[in-house]
């Protein structure tokens, strides 16, 4: 299938390293690949990564943004046959913006393209703004928990549970998880650092569905928010004794930690909270090697969300890498799992602040994120198209 060959309005990289609004940005390639889907964008959401596309990560002329919702305008043959997608479908998508290998594809635009396995069909009772916040968090966190950390997904997360069992990871950890709604019984605990972030509330929900107890950190003002998403206990990340408090709460037995913030301080917090026998630490960005070297009994790893698209990542090291077929295979199974969770109302999106100022307003939103004026909510912008 083809899309029309005209220019569009989009946020693109400028020659001087800024993000600017352009009315002459290129449309995505007119010829869709087999599993690609073309979408008329109706709403976009912002992520911290959108503010980090500077220096060698910045490509002049490339379109920025990685989450959007809209209406399908054209599909490749595989997107239709394998995923049942067609023109007129309302979808949300997770893609890689500011992509030097595909500079005409990004979320902050009137038109975009996404691989079918990174698209979700919207619920009938959802608007585009609500759906725009789905995407990267739900894919990246699932990859971090149920593959890289090696946690079992459990029967509530089918077909992932049976079709993609987790690989063996070191150190070996015994997991005790009754069915999520099966009453009492011992449950393995996972720490979520950054519980009030969009990835944090996503992680809490997925861990609870998988049958884990969740201990989270956040600022004190967001305690109620974090608890409302299912955290069993919440600790103030700014407290000098937070690591010791978590260690006491878990009786020196914590062995699993997901770091949704990933600074030297949060890595240090997680390492300090993990019990005497060590465990596994997974972050959503590269972690401090210095901190990681402080405890040999803790195995550290980190994940890169765009890897799930299965394509080469053209960003510089340490993010740049060849396409990962294993990540794509995981994502295809996870996509069907996530669609099922969405359809049956088993998950909630992160709290949103919706603005109707379009792509021009996104520039203001990026400044809000840079200046740390956003906490416990996700910025979403509807487009006047």
From Swiss-Prot:
Pfam families linked: ADH_N (PF08240), ADH_zinc_N (PF00107)
Function noted in UniProt: Trans-enoyl reductase; part of the gene cluster that mediates the biosynthesis of the tetramic acids Sch210971 and Sch210972, potential anti-HIV fungal natural product that contain a decalin core. The PKS module of tasS together with the enoylreductase tasC catalyze the formation of the polyketide unit which is then conjugated to 4-hydroxyl-4-methyl glutamate (HMG) by the condensation domain of the tasS NRPS module.
Organism of provenance: Hapsidospora irregularis
Subunit structure, interactors included: Monomer.
InterPro entries: ADH-like_C (IPR013149), ADH-like_N (IPR013154), GroES-like_sf (IPR011032), NAD(P)-bd_dom_sf (IPR036291), PKS_ER (IPR020843), Trans-enoyl_RdTase-like (IPR047122)
Higher taxonomy: Eukaryota, Fungi, Dikarya, Ascomycota, Pezizomycotina
Matches recorded under SUPFAM superfamilies: GroES-like, NAD(P)-binding Rossmann-fold domains
Protein known as: Trans-enoyl reductase tasC
EC number(s) stated in the UniProt entry for this protein: 1.-.-.-
Assigned keywords, A-Z: NADP, Nucleotide-binding, Oxidoreductase
């Amino acid at each position: 299938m083809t899309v029309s060959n005209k220019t569009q309005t989009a946020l693109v990289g400028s020659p001087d390293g800024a993000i600017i609004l352009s009315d002459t940005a290129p449309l995505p390639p007119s010829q869709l690949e087999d599993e690609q889907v073309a979408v008329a964008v109706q709403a976009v959401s912002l992520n911290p990564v959108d503010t980090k596309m500077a220096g060698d990560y910045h490509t002049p002329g490339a379109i920025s943004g990685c989450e959007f919702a809209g209406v399908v305008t054209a599909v490749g043959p595989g997107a239709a046959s394998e995923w049942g997608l067609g023109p007129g479908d309302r979808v949300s998508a997770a893609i890689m913006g500011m992509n030097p290998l595909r500079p005409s594809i990004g979320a902050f635009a009137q038109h975009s393209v996404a691989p079918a396995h990174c698209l979700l069909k919207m619920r009938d009772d959802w608007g585009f703004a609500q759906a725009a916040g789905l995407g990267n968090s739900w894919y990246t966190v699932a990859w971090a928990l149920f593959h890289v950390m090696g946690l079992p997904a459990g029967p509530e997360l089918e077909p992932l549970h049976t079709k993609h069992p987790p690989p063996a990871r070191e150190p070996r950890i015994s997991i005790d998880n009754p069915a999520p709604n099966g009453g009492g019984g011992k449950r393995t605990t996972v720490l979520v650092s950054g519980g009030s972030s969009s990835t944090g509330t996503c992680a809490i929900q997925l861990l609870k569905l998988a049958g884990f107890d969740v201990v989270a950190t956040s600022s004190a003002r967001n305690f109620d928010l974090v608890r409302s998403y299912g955290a069993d206990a919440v600790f103030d990340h700014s407290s000098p004794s937070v690591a010791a408090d978590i260690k006491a709460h878990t009786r020196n037995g914590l062995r699993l930690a997901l770091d949704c913030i990933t600074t030297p301080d949060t890595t240090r917090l997680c390492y300090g909270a993990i019990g005497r026998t060590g465990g596994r630490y997974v972050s959503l960005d590269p972690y401090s090697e210095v901190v990681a070297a402080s405890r040999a009994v803790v195995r550290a790893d980190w994940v890169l969300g765009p890897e799930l698209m299965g394509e080469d990542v053209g960003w510089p090291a340490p993010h740049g890498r060849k396409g990962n077929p294993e990540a794509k295979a995981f994502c295809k199974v996870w996509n069907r799992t996530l669609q099922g969770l969405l359809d049956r109302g088993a998950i909630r999106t992160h709290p949103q602040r919706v603005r109707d100022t379009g792509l021009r307003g996104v520039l203001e939103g990026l400044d809000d994120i840079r200046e740390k004026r956003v906490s416990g909510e996700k910025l979403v912008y509807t487009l006047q198209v």
